[in-house]
Amino acid sequence: MATQEAPLFKIHDATVRRKEKVILHVDDFELAEGENIALLGPNGAGKSTFIQLLTREVLPLHRDVPPVIFRGQERPSLADIKACFGVVSNTMHDQVRVHLPARDIVCGGLFGTLGIPRHVHATEADFKKAEEQLERLGIGELANRDIMTMSTGQVRRVLVARELVHDPQALIFDEPCTGLDPEGMYQLRGVMRQLASEGRSVILVTHYPEDIIPAIDRVLLIKDAAIYADGKKEELLTGDCMTELFGVPLAVESNHGWYSLREKFDEGE
């Protein structure tokens, strides 16, 4: 008799506090292995805290039964969680203020550092892995270029390559298109599509339905430090839901699996 595979994550009755304030409460949530999902909501709703709960950057209030279970383990090691995930965020982008070639930035992903640590001797095999990931994302020609001379979109793809170099099963994109021009957005959304097609989980945090690639079927709406709704994107990416979520009149349009959001003004405004 086949046993059912444990979900990647299972959360039950998890509360995160900052000082005396609840900044996130999750009643029930499960994410299957290989599942793609988008977290959508306004600033301060709890989206980033939700991701930090998954990656153990924040811990929930203690319960006799741990509220967050990873692959069936009640007390997984931090090393196991880090090995599973790659994270691309604006915070990481802001830390890239060093004159290093892209190859060294990507190679640092093998050691969990930004660049190669001084006490580590990177091998030719390490550099080859880094170059392969840059090639895979269509930026192999940037391998020896100083990252400080690159466009925002190029840097963002270098950071994706840095996460891919340790072969994670899931990629978290936290507001990945912030600060990008249309070309950069196009390229990064293409990267997410590529990773999803390979069977990796894509977990996207965003304010904008435009960032949600067609391969993402499930949407989690976060509002007021809690899950407001969880379901199929075609059911939740509607004008009524978005208006309720963001608190202003909004309309949603869809085209071949892509969604776009626009303000809805009264006639004459």
Label every model-predicted segment:
Residues 121, 146-150:
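Conserved ABC ATPase signature
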Residues 122-142:
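Conserved ABC ATPase "signature" region
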Residues 167:
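Conserved catalytic motifs of ABC-family nucleotide-binding domains
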Residues 171-175:
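Catalytic Walker B motif of ABC-type/P-loop ATPase nucleotide-binding domains
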Residues 206-207:
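H-loop/switch region of ABC-family ATPase nucleotide-binding domains
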Residues 243-269:
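ABC ATPase nucleotide-binding domains
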